Amino acid sequence: KTQGNAGYIDVKEANIYEEKKIETLFKDADFCINLIGILYEKKRGNTFKNIHTVFPTILAKLCKKYNLKHFIHVSALGINEATDSKYAISKLEGENNILNNFPKSTILRPSIVFSNSDNFSTQFMTLLNRLPIFPLYYSGKTKFMPIHCTDLTEIIYHILTNKVETQVI
């Protein structure tokens, strides 16, 4: 479901592995917002490297080629500390590639993004209610602050409308 008046949001379907089709989406764009990420790898194609490193790098290069005003990339909280994680390493590599290829970028590092209708929040809250204890990873130093998708959307809107300078948030 999209939010916005007719003409302000133009939804297009594309496969992230079809670089030429992705490029056609940039020709009339002002901004690029990348929300794509995975929490676990599948055997075919959808690896951390492809999704978190290669694809964002392609987007950053296209932002530069078509002189977009801004690129917002949603990454992940706590990736600096998780140096032994393939997930975190791929996220950091993607961030570095973005900033090197298109400096007019903002990297957002939220924790888990949830909505009222997703399985994550329901399953997680059920676990918290049923378990007598809850395991804390990395000696309890894991940063875990779920954010509702509406709040994340408001942050992105604020960045775009207030011309927030490049930074990692």
Tell where the protein language model's regions lie, with residue ranges.
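Conserved beta-strand segments of alpha/beta enzyme cores
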Residues: 10, 104-106, 167
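Conserved Rossmann-fold NAD(P)-dependent oxidoreductase catalytic core, especially the SDR/UDP-sugar
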Residues: 50-101, 105-111
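Flexible, glycine-rich beta-alpha linker
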Residues: 85, 106-125, 141-143
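N-terminal Rossmann NAD(P)H-binding glycine-rich loop of SDR-like oxidoreductase domains
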Residues: 1
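A short C-terminal helix-loop "cap" of Rossmann-like NAD(P)-dependent dehydrogenase/epimerase domains
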Residues: 125-138
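Substrate-positioning beta->alpha
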Residues: 119-120, 139-161, 167
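NAD(P)H-binding glycine-rich loop region in Rossmannoid oxidoreductase-like domains
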Residues: 5-65, 77-81
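Conserved sequence/active-site signature of Rossmann-fold short-chain dehydrogenase/reductase
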Residues: 17, 79, 113-115, 152
